[in-house]
Structure formats: structure tokens, C-alpha cells
Amino acid sequence: LLVPGRLQKSISRGGKMRIGGWAKLLTLLLVLALVAVACERDEEEAGGEAAGGTEAAAQAEGGTLLDEIKERGTLRCGVNNTVPGFGFDPGGGNIDGFDIDFCRAFAAAIFNTSDNIDDLIELIPIDADNRFIALQNGDYDVLVRNTTWTTSRDGAEGVAFMHPNFYDGQAMMVRKGEFDSINEMNDTSICVTTGTTTELNLADYFAERNLEFEPIAFEDNTQLQRAFIQGRCDGWTSDRSQLAGIRSQWPADEGGPESLVIMDEVMSKEPLAPGTLDTELELRDALDAVVNGVILAEELGVSSENVDQFVEDPGSGPIAALLGAPVLDPETGESAPIEHGLGLDGDFMVSVLRAVGNYGEIFNRHVGPNTDLGLQRGINALWTEGGIQYAIPFR
């Protein structure tokens, strides 16, 4: 602590100072020191707040993924291109299917148009093993690739899933006449795709029945099909819907679809759902509303064929709410469109229904009874028809 020069001289001359004078001096110096420390802390905190404010402003300026998609003008969907009916490329890069229609539906909602919808989507084929890494890396915006919703994918993989768009179950496909039940498949080789829930389910199912098997894993269905044709596998296990699609396109020179049998046993539950990054909940909520919207539209009888009629006369109940028309508020007696707060235009479902139709239309167009897959609705029927497809209310 430095002593003022005048005081030093006074002390040196007199040789001593009264105790009361020393006490006053020390008190004054202590107060000055505390004030200096407090000022320094205030400056540090102010600097920290300024830095934090700058960072928050930068994040706000950056916007969300939904904002980025709107700015970009296209929606990038990670898809499959090897599963007939769901995501399949017959050649020339023309991928189509059940999941592709959901990509179209999402784009129709985001951009609120049904015009030239394929110009608003970018389909990015991705294999099962790399789909989550690619999502985290920002290679695409939304995963629409027959993906099972599980706890670890929801948590560790960082995926925010939407309402399941297809409830499935794992099955086993074999050559006709070789096996009648999975219980007969002891000491067999089973082909499976890597990076899927199918691998784990296969091991669990066979272990529970004390069956020995050799798993032969492949990265994609093209490699797996080649191995199956070569006789390297006694069975091919995957989601039943996938096996139905693959069977429907089985080469004629290998016996065609009639040469294969999908056995009746259901090896697991497979709720298939679209997903996006769990850091992008605005996008997740917006697209989840689309999945629920097409299911609700089927329940209410609104389709691609009659949506324009309902736009002209929507009433004031659930159909009006679905289509973004004014809805009667029983408390106020007034009518106004519902404010969903989803980052979408209020009438986004009109564009969705014009582009792809309701859930039943999408199902029947790609995988239903009159397609090569010939799937029945089963548990994917509406809850009013004995299934478990059930949409949240548009309220």
C-alpha cells in the first residue's frame, strides 16, 4: 500500500503520528480499495453480458432450419431408393413411393403450394448405416426413410421423430417350399441389413427360441438381394412392408414373386416415422402437423378430389380448422382462423391435400391392395376402422 508523499514527510519530521490519525487513514484507504475492486467486477460483468448479447443476436440472425429451408427454396429429404412402394428408383433417378409422397407433403406445407412440387424437393438416397450421421452433418433436412422410432434413436442419435406414418413389424422371407415357420430355421444363415433394428431383433428372436443361426450383414438391399439369389442366405429378414416390396419386384428369371414366401410370424414392432434434428423442434412440430393432418383429413372425408369444394364451403367445425378457415369460438361467439404457431401459413393443409391427398390416398397409391405390394391397411387403418392411426386435433 503506497503512503502519500506529504504524509511520509510528516512522519519523517515528527517521528510519530497519533493513533486516531492512523485509524482514519487506514479506513479511507480500505474504502478506496473496495470501490476499485467493485468497479473492476462491474466492468467484467458488463463485458460478459455484452458478449452474451452479441452471441444471442448472432443466433437469432442465423434463424432456424425451417427459415433456412424457406430461404433456400427446396426441402432436402434423406430417402431410400431400394424399397419398392416406399422409396424406389426403377432407373434414371426417378425415385417414388409412400415416403416420397410425405416429402412432397412436407414441401407443400412449408412453401404453401401444390404447383410443381417435385421442383421443391431434393431426394438424397442414404443407406441405413449412415442415415443418422448424415442427418447430424446437415446433409439433408428431414429423414423420410422407413426408419423405426426407438428410444436410443430419439436420445443418443439426436433425432426428433414425428407421428409414425406406417406401423410395421419384422418378418422373414424364404424360398417357397423350404420352410413353413421360423421355428424350423435352426442352423441357418440369415441375410440382414446393417445399421437397422432388424439385426438386434433377429438375435433376440432366435435366442428366445434356442435357435442357432449365422447372420450375414449387408449395407443395402441391392447387395443383399444378390447374396440371396446366390444362395448364401436361407432367409431374408426385414420389415414386412419392405419384404413385400422386394418380393413384388423379384426377377422373373429367378422365379418371380411366386417363388418367395413371407412367413406369418411377426418378430417385432416397427413404428416407422419421419424425423429431423432434435435441435430443430420448430421444423419437427411443423412437419408432425402435416403427418397428423393427412390422417385427420381421411377421417373427415377430405381428399385431393374434394378439397377445393371444402375450401369454398368449409363450415365452422373440424374441417374448417384443418383447412385454415375461420372457426367459431364458443366463448366469444366470433370466428377466426386458428393460430397454430407452427411457422406455416394457416391454410397449409390445403396445399398438402392438393399435392398428395389424404393418408388413405397415399397408402393406396403406393402400397395398397391394388398395387404390386398388395398390402391391406391392417393396423394402419384409422382408429374408426379398427386400426391405430389416430391424429391429434387441429385446435
Residue ranges of each PLM-predicted region?
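Bilobed "Venus flytrap"/periplasmic-binding protein-like clamshell domains
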Residues: 76-85, 95-112, 148, 168-226, ...
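Extracytoplasmic small-molecule ligand-binding "clamshell" domains
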Residues: 58-64, 68-143, 330-332, 344, ...
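Short, Lys/Arg-enriched N-terminal segments with co-localized hydrophobic residues
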Residues: 1-16
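Bacterial N-terminal signal peptides that target proteins for export
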Residues: 15-26
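Acidic, polar ligand-binding/catalytic clefts
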Residues: 104, 108, 115-184, 243-268, ...
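Extended ligand-binding regions for polar small-molecule ligands
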Residues: 40, 53-60, 104, 108, ...
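Bacterial lipoprotein signal-peptidase II cleavage site
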Residues: 40-49
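C-terminal motif of bacterial Sec signal peptides marking the signal peptidase cleavage site
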Residues: 34-38
